[in-house]
């Protein structure tokens, strides 16, 4: 399995050539028509590119998020040396992700996406996404 920035057949072929037997493509499915995230979140994903992402370190891992009040606060805390535990508490656990991803509230939540969002140019169906990923 390969993951990270895979949004089309070119990326899928590249990791396949390196030995991967499958891909985990997250962000491209989040922006699909059938996804339950609000259209406002899908539009933000389509409009964004990799340079828009906010990167911060917390438990259990690094997060990439679209700009918003909470994600900007988390980046500032991370840069100021806050502990991973402090950052995890400020994120609000899964509540922060739910508010951002499922309600589009980026004041109290965050929209977590991957580095491949720059290759997502439209809101398409899951069938189209699968066809785009076909090796």
PLM regions with names:
Residues 1, 6-135:
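Conserved active-site-proximal phosphate/metal-binding subdomains
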């Amino acid at each position: 399995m390969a993951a990270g920035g895979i949004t089309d057949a070119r990326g899928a072929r590249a990791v396949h050539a390196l030995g991967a037997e499958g891909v985990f493509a997250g962000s491209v499915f989040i922006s699909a028509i059938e996804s339950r995230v609000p259209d406002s979140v899908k539009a933000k994903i389509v409009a964004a590119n990799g340079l828009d992402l906010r990167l911060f370190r917390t438990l259990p891992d690094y997060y990439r998020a679209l700009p918003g009040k909470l994600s900007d606060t988390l980046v500032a805390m991370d840069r100021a040396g806050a502990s991973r535990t402090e950052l995890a508490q400020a994120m609000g656990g899964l509540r922060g992700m739910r508010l951002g991803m499922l309600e589009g509230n980026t004041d109290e939540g965050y929209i977590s996406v991957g580095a491949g969002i720059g290759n997502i140019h439209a809101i398409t169906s899951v069938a189209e996404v699968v066809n785009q990923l076909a090796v």
